[in-house]
């Protein structure tokens, strides 16, 4: 598999995403899947009502609540592995910092539909969202653990505001709902071993179905104002740092938090 950094950088700048097919081998995915499934089963047990009624994702997979020391170290080593960091550097060349992890799965509720959104809409009103997409953005690095229907993205919306159709659907105005199809949407089917990189603030939705279970690693530019969103518990304990081959991604976040 040949990865062309300059092509991927240019594509991301223009479109707001890119996919590298078969980036991880079977052994890497099997090892990651084992740890993540351990977290997922414990999380489901602990959040039964929420899981049954509405959940489609969880977060803080690297936290201390569900995984023991050694499994957390395995996750931190995957997140900061040469393969991941090489791609991180394509989109955040200087001082990338770790924000969090999320796990995306199918909702139990069969009436629940996938929906269009920009991540920034959960923190900002409309005018602030317009500003957010012109500034430094958080980047998702999605690793599907099983073959899945993938994502639907609106290319280029990391750098432009919604058109009329997109806005009405995303905001559920004038009779539209956020699960309606968009004429500008592009479906990206994913398989175990693929890596999807996309801007958190582009218009996107996950596609429910198949055995959907995808680990998202969220990374931000240290120059951005995001450190307040980082939960201390998702970072490695000091005693873990010498067991992580390349802890720079986490140390950058720790340094930012110490200055906050």
Regions found by a protein language model. Give the residues of each.
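Non-heme Fe(II)/2-oxoglutarate
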Residues: 48, 195, 201-260
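Active-site glycine-rich loop that binds ribose-phosphate moieties when present
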Residues: 120-129, 175-181
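A short secondary-structure junction signal
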Residues: 111-118, 125-128, 151-157, 162-166, ...
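Non-heme Fe(II)-dependent double-stranded beta-helix
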Residues: 1-14, 21-127, 238-240
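A structural signal for short, well-ordered beta-strand segments
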Residues: 101-103, 141-143, 215-219
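Short edge-strand/loop segments of extracellular domains
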Residues: 106-107, 158-161, 219-225
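Secondary-structure boundary elements
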Residues: 85-97, 132-134, 144-150
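Double-stranded beta-helix
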Residues: 134, 138, 144-203
